[in-house]
A protein has these predicted regions:
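Charge-rich, low-complexity amphipathic helices
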Residues: 89, 164-165, 235-236
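Gly-rich Lys/Arg/Thr-decorated short loops/hinges at beta-loop-alpha junctions or inter-strand turns
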Residues: 149-168
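Short amphipathic alpha-helical segments, especially helix-boundary/capping motifs
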Residues: 41-45, 88-90, 119, 150-155, ...
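Conserved phosphoryl-transfer catalytic core
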Residues: 84-93, 97-98, 105
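Active-site cores of enzymes that catalyze phosphoryl transfer or operate on phosphate-rich substrates
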Residues: 100-155
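DNA-dependent DNA polymerase catalytic subunits
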Residues: 1-83, 124-127, 131, 135, ...
Length: 365
């Protein structure tokens, strides 16, 4: 519905983009059937290596629609690429006297998204709210994918200079946001793609800070999304936070995890409970003895049989056994079940699995 293509086309990623491009009234060109350039590696988004530790009073700030913003700011597009244009900073030059196809289509999708978000707020039933939420998310995803098609080496609109220009200008935008915070006395502890985590004493001070940053970096806009009373930084894309303020308002603590094992569905509930309790304890500022006591209690419950099935993992057979190059983990449990229980799991079957004292995996229903 959004891009006016049939349902079979939607999963193909680049085809919906083609549909949007050819609907643009100002675009009079053609979409090549095959890419015109050989694949070239280019630098992607920046991810700062954090210093592991526990931090307090951490503000999470995002650059609003960063790729879209930089496409518009520098007029990055296939249709504006010109030796006589303005250098975006990495040597690629773009004509500033006419609007580019990429920016126009991104603008169209953003206008649509704002319409859907307004309809979602006006909705009076859960069904309507879900419908408009799905539509606004679809437009957001479509805008993000429009950058991606320029870097897809199998697509007719592939152009390494376009993709590299977008990622270069976006990295520079993130670096500038980082410098703005550091120079104003708010240390940045982590940064990823379009967001930074910096130490700010209070949400109120964070609001004042982001207002000054937006004045300095206009037309690029930064949003103050969350404020964490405490945060654990472990590594790139691996962190946990105790969020107590979101989008302008205080609320009860919410524990937010990114890239940590307890998010994996296959992990045993008991292991998730242990990790969740440990992380919450650290975020809440509890003493190590208190956290150790909690974990000792879990271990004792496991040894006495109180945890039951929460000690078990979930497994799924992804392909026939003969197609696995090596048999290990949960798949080894499937082999054990076949040999000892005469249980023959089929592709996509799910099962419970456990590990014996000797490292042997067992699978059963």
């Amino acid at each position: 519905h959004l891009v006016q293509c049939d349902i079979e086309t939607v999963p193909m990623t680049t085809a919906p983009a083609t549909s949007l491009f050819i609907q643009d009234e100002q675009f009079k060109g053609r979409i090549p059937d095959d890419p015109r350039f050989n694949k070239v590696d280019y630098e992607g988004a920046d991810v700062q290596e954090p210093e592991p530790g526990r931090y307090t009073n951490m503000a999470i700030m995002d650059i609003k629609a960063m790729y879209h913003s930089n496409v518009k700011l520098h007029n990055i597009c296939w249709t504006t690429l010109s030796e006589d244009g303005k250098d975006c900073g990495n040597g690629s030059k773009f004509d500033q006297d006419k609007s580019g196809l990429l920016g126009r289509v991104m603008d169209k999708m953003t206008v649509k998204r704002n319409e859907y978000k307004a309809l979602m707020k006006q909705a009076t039933t859960d069904a309507d709210k879900r419908k408009w939420d799905a539509m606004q998310f679809a437009t957001k995803s479509m805008v993000a994918s429009l950058y991606g098609v320029s870097g897809d080496s199998k697509y007719g609109m592939y152009h390494p200079d376009i993709a590299a220009a977008i990622t270069y200008t976006s990295r520079q935008t993130l670096f500038r946001l980082r410098d703005e915070c550091n120079d104003r006395g708010y240390p940045v502890r982590y940064g990823h793609t379009d967001s930074i985590f910096c130490e700010v004493p209070s949400p109120e001070e964070g609001m004042q800070l982001v207002a000054k940053i937006n004045e300095s970096m206009a037309p690029i806009e930064t949003e103050f999304e969350k404020w964490c009373e405490s945060m654990i930084l472990k590594a790139k894309n691996r962190y946990a936070g105790k969020v107590t303020w979101t989008d302008g308002g205080y609320h009860d603590p919410e524990y937010y995890y990114k890239g940590l094992e307890l998010k994996q569905a296959r992990m045993p509930k008991a292991m998730k409970s242990a990790m969740d309790g440990t992380l919450r304890g650290i975020l809440d500022g509890k003493d190590r003895e208190d956290i150790d006591d909690y974990l000792i209690g879990l271990i004792n419950d496991g040894n006495t049989g109180k945890l039951g099935e929460s000690l078990l993992m979930k497994g799924r057979l992804r392909r026939p056994l003969h197609k696995y190059k090596s048999i290990s983990g949960a798949v080894a449990g499937v082999v054990w079940a076949k040999e000892h229980l005469d249980k023959r799991y089929q592709v996509d079957d799910t099962f419970l699995t456990a590990i014996g004292a000797g490292g042997q995996y067992y699978a059963f229903d």
